[in-house]
Amino acid sequence: MTLDRSTIWPYDEHGEPREFYYSRYATPTVAEAETRVGELDGGAALLFPSGAGATSALVLSLLAPGDTIALAEGCYYGTSVTFGALEKWGLRLVEFDQTGPPPKNVQLVWLEAPSNPFLTMPDLEAAVAYPAPVVVDATVATPVHLRPLEHGADFVLHSATKYLAGHDDALLGAVVSRDHAAADALRVFRGRTGIVAAADPAWLLLRGLKTLELRVRRQGESAGLLAERLRGHPAVEVVRYAGFSGLLSFDVADGDAARRVETGTRLIVNATSLGGVTSVLESRTRWEGDRVPAGLIRLSVGLEDPDALWADLESALACA
């Protein structure tokens, strides 16, 4: 783990650039983190300053004005917002049920495994049978549970801010490509547009990857236990859990009840995001409006004692 904050490096003795010469194109720390992420997913990885940055760079490098993206319904709200911002450049967006095949006549298929916050899993086999490139946002699954490139996907995307870095202190995104030529083209695009990751968050990512599997498996065990207990609670109407990972969502009666629950916890932090060592929950209507049920609460389970988390949830649910 090397933390090199330099922005320039000297040329060689012949006056030619070495592997690292200007930080907009490559840095030792970012390159080390990319190698590690690529090993985990089985492809060629590139880092970006955020998940949204990774999404924008990948889409803009692959598509042209007039092209259409098929986006999984109920996907992460931020992804739909990013794509909406790109529509002014002539890109079109259609949403589809990712548990079935994508629509025809699209130039890119975008899946989530599982979706956030509805926790549906895509039909990868149906998607990769389609001729358009397939991107799988595997932020929630992580390479611990799913390596989409092994199932025929062309690209994997991670908001590395979440589980990969895992400590709520590093903002990063990652794209992993099955094809090294496609990764090289994206690397050129990244350098030309300046959508580049810095050394410090890349170093924090390297730190987080050391404990990735331990964290993710512990979070998944605790989330499974909490999902089971939530299903038996009288104030909870619906529980969504994919059977792995530390993310789940559940519905209470309405938006007012959801606000009382989210502000009623003491151990679980009322905050956004997911995948960190600290458990957080929030009412998602705050951001997503009528895209989600009014009473939907998203819970990202951290590394705390699951019985203590349940006691905290029970106390908050008494206010629902």
Residue map of PLM features:
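Conserved glycine-rich beta-strand-loop-beta hairpin in the small C-terminal domain of fold type I
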Residues: T2, A223-G224, R240-S249
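Short, conserved charged micro-motifs
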Residues: P101, G255-R260, D305-A311
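Conserved N-terminal alpha-helix of the aminotransferase class I/II PLP-enzyme fold
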Residues: T2, I8-A57, S61, G74-A85
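Short conserved active-site loop signatures built around small residues
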Residues: M1-D4, V175
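Short amphipathic alpha-helices in soluble, non-transmembrane regions
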Residues: L186, R259-R266, D312-L317
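Conserved C-terminal alpha-helix-loop-beta "cap" of PLP-dependent enzymes
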Residues: A242-I297, V301
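Conserved PLP-enzyme active-site core in the AAT-like
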Residues: A44-A235, R240
